[in-house]
């Protein structure tokens, strides 16, 4: 009985573990590897108005779905690790100030940047402000530029001399289109109840 209880606990813990997707070109496989993400993704989409494919494309670009992603540390003399150039962290790569604003506006004070649920909600929240800057929620390339530069930077045109950023924005748009097409054909499996794991 004890061994069976331990086995159930271990399976439960492993079921809660996060897997960095091995094939990030296929959203169906991403959600298969992390089935709990599906409801979190669609909850954010319904709450804030952005397509699930857009949310996932931005998170992919920002962190490659790594909950511990952070900018590389600067180096002194090219050798000694120093501070990071930005406070960006987690799936969404949100910086401290914007993350604090999100928590204050939503009341989600327990949010964590290493949590997919918190992060996908953050991205949806941030993109929901885009129409105020004249960006439609289906203009994925513009959404990404504004996400990267901030809405103030977008309105000032800070991106206009950043050809590399415009190329990245095109890639995000392409990923979003591909994810949307794939989502229409994803087989949806209901998660197994923990008490049926031995069936």
Segments from the language model and where they lie:
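Catalytic glycan-binding domains that act on GlcNAc-containing polysaccharides
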Residues: 18-194, 198
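Residue-level signal for mature regions of secreted extracellular proteins and peptides
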Residues: 9-10, 21
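C-terminal motif of bacterial Sec signal peptides marking the signal peptidase cleavage site
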Residues: 12-15
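Sec-dependent signal peptide recognition
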Residues: 2-9
């Amino acid at each position: 009985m004890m061994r069976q209880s331990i086995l159930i606990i271990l399976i439960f813990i492993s079921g809660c573990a996060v897997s960095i997707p091995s094939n990030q070109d296929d959203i169906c496989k991403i959600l298969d590897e992390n089935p709990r993400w599906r409801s979190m993704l669609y909850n954010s989409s319904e709450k804030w108005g952005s397509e699930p494919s857009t949310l996932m494309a931005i998170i992919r670009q920002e962190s490659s779905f790594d909950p511990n992603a952070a900018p590389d540390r600067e180096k002194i003399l090219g050798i000694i690790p120093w501070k990071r150039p930005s406070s960006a962290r987690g799936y969404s790569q949100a910086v401290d100030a914007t993350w604090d604003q999100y928590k204050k506006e939503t009341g989600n004070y327990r949010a964590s940047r290493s949590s997919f649920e918190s992060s996908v909600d953050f991205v949806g929240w941030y993109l929901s402000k885009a129409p105020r800057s004249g960006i439609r929620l289906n203009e994925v390339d513009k959404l990404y530029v504004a996400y990267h530069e901030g809405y103030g930077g977008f309105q000032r045109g800070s991106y206009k001399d950043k050809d590399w950023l415009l190329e990245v924005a095109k890639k995000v748009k392409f990923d979003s289109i591909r994810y949307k097409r794939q989502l229409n054909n994803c087989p949806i499996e209901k998660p197994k109840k923990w008490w049926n794991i031995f069936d």
